[in-house]
């Protein structure tokens, strides 16, 4: 299983989130998921909201084009990015 797949023009990411980190960044793979470190704390949905903004900026879309499909209360998350305008330099990530 890959950490990403395309669904039409949308990108689906399988992520492993590390909240309350020292920096915000993509830091490679964690098993079959993309590991993302965020400075936001894991309380009251703050890390999830911060993740949406982080991904929107990284993929060149608005926050409304990023949605959490699963993993609201878990570090393992599935996220949909609607028609990304740019692709960050991540292992194996390319357009279909």
Swiss-Prot record:
Protein family according to the UniProt entry: Belongs to the UPF0235 family.
Protein name, per record: UPF0235 protein Pfl01_5322
Species the sequence originates in: Pseudomonas fluorescens (strain Pf0-1)
Annotated transmembrane regions: none
SUPFAM superfamilies, per database record: YggU-like
One matching Pfam family: DUF167
Gene3D superfamilies: YggU-like
Gene Ontology CC terms, in alphabetical order: cytoplasm
